[in-house]
Amino acid sequence: MSKLTDLTMAEARDGLAKGAFTAVELTDAHIKATEAQRHLNAFIVETPDLALEAAKASDARRQAGTAGSMDGLPIGIKDLFCTEGVQTTAASHILEGFKPPYESTVSGKLKAAGAISLGKLNLDEFAMGSSNQTSYFGAVENPWKKTSDPKAKLVPGGSSGGSAAAVAARMVLGATGTDTGGSIRQPAAFCGITGIKPTYGRCSRFGIVAFASSLDQAGPMARTVRDCAIMLGAMAGHDPKDSTSVNMAVPDFERALTGDIRGLKVGIPKEYRPDGLSDEVAKVWDRGIEWLKAAGATPVEISLPHTKYALATYYIIAPAECSSNLARYDGLRYGLRVPGKTLDDMYKKSRAAGFGAEVRRRILIGTYVLSAGYYDAYYAKAQKVRRLIAEDFRKAFETVDVILTPTAPSAAFGMGEGTDDPVTMWLNDVFTIPTSMAGLPGLSLPAGLSADGLPLGLQLIGRPFDEETVFRVAGVMETAANFTAKPEGV
């Protein structure tokens, strides 16, 4: 039998149902894998004792015939989701030691389905970053290595870098992520796993530490398309505590994996071949198009003309919302407090000490674009361009069923690269941001390896609330890609 940590979530679920092993055995195997790979720094908080208690309760439910849809499956929770009684930091000094008195809706739904949390996963501070190097608790290391330089440490992508690294390194069967401009899809591509940002409003944002409220969306990260479908089924659903949560039935995403995509039209946007796109990524994209043709789908060239404005638009809207959301961290009620001579002095000192450089940068940008003299020139104009970007997608989906693009312009890069050049770092999300601006579902799956042995991902974009078609096409591509590689030593 395979090592328990090599099982996919679906395989582990079936094994538990057949009695091949217990939830305690499965959980213990993943706890040991987590302990053996602490050098990756994927977790901020590990909760092995709580996990084993939950596993015992899971085995009891199974014995009683009341097991949930994810009962006994070990997962990790990105440390942006509030977890009752367990430290939640958003990877920031300003929230160090904060233990929420309530549970986020998404983590609560997973717990109700029987999933077992092994702890809180590392991320870029307040989810602001594309490389997981901005965390107050240290950078996360990608478990993959370059064949040409095995000693070089690589980034896992961000902001959900801890989630991606933990899944790729077989510490957990799946993990929650959040995606504001690519924070599920880009790290999934860098770490050779699958991740989906659902349609905005599919999953509740209640209890998720806010970055940009009109963009943030929770989603699953796992090793296969089926595993993501299983997780999203448990995570999604209407929540009256979140006014942006959409009141519609949650489909059986797993049933969408029919393997039949004959007759579907797949959009190939011509604007997604910019200067600087690596030849390897372009070749993987072309290969993906051929896989879909072979399965009976028809590729159709489409135009998304406002794509070129998406990055600039995002870096006006997201910082504007971030500057507003992060105004609540004042050192008064919870988190870090640095004493000052006056109340204003205490605010300034607490925020200066509590926020990292990237977070301060985005707060400053946001405050600037919202200021009286610049609001119309920047923020109001950006919102108009955002509408045009969404309209491009709406028109495209009149003629195609899904859109296929690369996920990231390159494979994972080395730690320390680009940290002194924020614009270069922001360009990592050039293919994922337009989808976020339009609120559409986007899934990344591993499609091949670079010449240096690093994973390369492809992105599928769907119509609003049509994650089922995205999953259906992704399942076919996953079979064609037959991506079985894993990090060495895992």
UniProtKB/Swiss-Prot annotation:
<dbReference type="GO" id="GO:0005524">
    <property type="term" value="F:ATP binding"/>
</dbReference>
<feature type="active site" description="Acyl-ester intermediate">
    <location>
        <position position="183"/>
    </location>
</feature>
<comment type="subunit">
    <text>Heterotrimer of A, B and C subunits.</text>
</comment>
<protein>
    <recommendedName>
        <fullName>Glutamyl-tRNA(Gln) amidotransferase subunit A</fullName>
        <ecNumber>6.3.5.7</ecNumber>
    </recommendedName>
</protein>
<dbReference type="InterPro" id="IPR020556">
    <property type="entry name" value="Amidase_CS"/>
</dbReference>
<keyword id="KW-0547">Nucleotide-binding</keyword>
<feature type="active site" description="Charge relay system">
    <location>
        <position position="159"/>
    </location>
</feature>
<feature type="active site" description="Charge relay system">
    <location>
        <position position="78"/>
    </location>
</feature>
<keyword id="KW-0436">Ligase</keyword>
<keyword id="KW-0648">Protein biosynthesis</keyword>
<comment type="similarity">
    <text>Belongs to the amidase family. GatA subfamily.</text>
</comment>
<dbReference type="InterPro" id="IPR004412">
    <property type="entry name" value="GatA"/>
</dbReference>
<keyword id="KW-0067">ATP-binding</keyword>
<dbReference type="GO" id="GO:0006412">
    <property type="term" value="P:translation"/>
</dbReference>
<dbReference type="InterPro" id="IPR023631">
    <property type="entry name" value="Amidase_dom"/>
</dbReference>
<dbReference type="GO" id="GO:0030956">
    <property type="term" value="C:glutamyl-tRNA(Gln) amidotransferase complex"/>
</dbReference>
<dbReference type="GO" id="GO:0050567">
    <property type="term" value="F:glutaminyl-tRNA synthase (glutamine-hydrolyzing) activity"/>
</dbReference>
<comment type="function">
    <text>Allows the formation of correctly charged Gln-tRNA(Gln) through the transamidation of misacylated Glu-tRNA(Gln) in organisms which lack glutaminyl-tRNA synthetase. The reaction takes place in the presence of glutamine and ATP through an activated gamma-phospho-Glu-tRNA(Gln).</text>
</comment>
<dbReference type="InterPro" id="IPR036928">
    <property type="entry name" value="AS_sf"/>
</dbReference>
<dbReference type="InterPro" id="IPR000120">
    <property type="entry name" value="Amidase"/>
</dbReference>
<dbReference type="Pfam" id="PF01425">
    <property type="entry name" value="Amidase"/>
</dbReference>
